[in-house]
Regions:
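Short glycine-rich anion-binding loops that position phosphate/pyrophosphate groups of nucleotides
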Residues: 19, 62, 146-148
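Surface-exposed, active-site-proximal loop segments in enzymatic domains
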Residues: 23-30, 71-72, 158
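Acidic-leg catalytic submotif of subtilisin-like serine proteases
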Residues: 10-20
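A basic- and aromatic-enriched beta-loop-alpha substructure that forms the phosphate/nucleotide-
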Residues: 61-79
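Active-site-adjacent betaalpha module
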Residues: 1-10, 44-52, 74-207
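A short alpha/beta connector and helix-capping loop motif
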Residues: 7, 25-49, 53-56
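Catalytic P-loop NTPase motifs of RecA-like helicase/translocase cores
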Residues: 20-21, 175
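Short beta-strand segments at enzyme active-site cores
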Residues: 54-61, 67, 168
Length: 207
């Protein structure tokens, strides 16, 4: 059975902000009926990790202006395509917009926050790796949105950086649909790390 040391483990919550998870303001929303249950499961996970002295780092997508988003050719094309899940992406998480706010139930004053994520990568052009190394991490527990893109990308990159990767299976979801969400979990299990539910994570941490 997998064993995790809380002294060298860090939770990374990716894009768990209102821009995905608050149907009232979300610009790239998870289906509304999935938001509440996911937030509840993620809140239970993060609270349990904090109780076990595991640091929590939030990574938040944030853009200065729409031009930063439109610099990506696929995203620019998807913005006006009604058949794309990412339609309207040029309005997503502009600096100062309510979408950039971390979901209140998931944030604690003790948590650390990395802002300014610009693409699917949580590592590219951010100080996430620096922060993880400073915290003494050899293991990351990944939670967040979307399983199919940003979480998957973080799992690949963390693996390439030789972190042990655990995917918090109860605290990830995708606006790309259930089939793609489950496919991403299977891919990560096959090649990148350990998808575990909340209780299995707590057991691996020794409690």
């Amino acid at each position: 059975m997998l064993r995790l040391d809380p002294r060298t483990t860090v939770a990374v919550a990716i894009d768990m902000h209102r821009g995905h998870l608050d149907p009232a303001v979300a610009t790239l929303p998870l289906p509304a009926e999935r938001c509440g249950p996911l937030i509840k499961r993620a809140a239970a996970l993060l609270a349990g990790l904090r109780e076990r002295a595991v640091p929590v780092v939030h990574v938040v997508t944030e853009y200065r202006d729409a031009a930063e988003i439109a610099a990506n050719p696929f995203w620019k094309a998807a913005h006006d395509d009604p058949g794309k899940a990412r339609r309207g992406i040029l309005r997503h998480n502009l600096r100062g917009s309510p979408g950039t706010e971390i979901i209140a139930e998931l944030h604690d004053p003790r948590d650390l926050v990395v802002r300014g994520k610009k693409r699917y990568s949580s590592f590219h052009a951010t100080d996430l790796e620096f922060l993880l190394r400073r915290l003494g991490a050899d293991t990351v527990i990944l939670a967040g949105i979307n399983t199919t893109t940003c979480v998957l990308c973080a799992a690949f990159e963390a693996t390439n950086l030789d972190f042990r990767v655990v995917i918090a299976a109860d605290a990830v979801d995708s606006m790309d649909g259930e089939d793609m969400h489950r496919f991403a979990l299977r891919l990560m299990q096959a090649a990148l790390g350990w998808p575990l539910g909340n209780e299995d994570i707590f057991q691996a941490l020794g409690a």
